[in-house]
Amino acid sequence: MGAGILPVSVRNGKLYFLFGKENKYADTPGWSDFGGGTDGNETPQMTVIREGQEELTGFLGGPNEIKTMLSKCVHKLNINNYTMFVCPMEYNEWLPFYYNNNQRFLQTHLDQDVIKNSKIFEKSEIKWFSESELRKLKPQCRSYFQNIVEQLMLDLPKIRRVVRTKSKTRKR
């Protein structure tokens, strides 16, 4: 069993999803959400809180911030014992720039064994992908995650409705 979080945002009327790319040591390379396997008796939500912090090295915040994101979840996918929570966040075009520069610096200056064995360096970069880029992204995703992207594309109309409704509510 496993779980992950996929941040979503609206920009210029289109949905954008924040994906992370596995580092060069990953057994299954490619793009995916921010998640992983459950530890012990963790619930999917507990897994997301832990994994979201680890894989984004705190860029989305700590446990309270991840819990808040989860409480605003707009869509949930369950595929092959994996639960993915699609959660809205404000679009920040600079987030990938800062995260990616930070990761490049750390991953070139730290001992490679630390990078290889530490849970906080699983992602080498992050990037916003628009809803129209998902089909092109799918073959670049981790093998297990390609089915999840396929289902995500099928669910886009539903996600679009909910995210736009929630973003209009927040602006009032």
Short names for language-model regions:
Residues G61, E65-D111:
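Acidic, glycine-rich loop-and-strand cores that form catalytic or ligand-binding grooves
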Residues M1-F34:
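N-terminal strand-loop-strand
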Residues M1, Y16, N81-F85, E125-K127:
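Short beta-strand micro-motifs in enzyme catalytic cores
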Residues A26, G30-G35, G40, L77, ...:
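Functional cleft and adjacent loop/helix regions within the main domain
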Residues P7-S9, K21, V86-P88, K127-S130:
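Short, well-ordered beta-strand micro-motif
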Residues T38, M89, L134:
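Hydrophobic pocket-lining residues within nucleotide cofactor-binding pockets
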Residues D33-S71:
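The catalytic Nudix box helix
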Residues Y25-G30, W94-R172:
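Nudix hydrolase/Nudix homology domain
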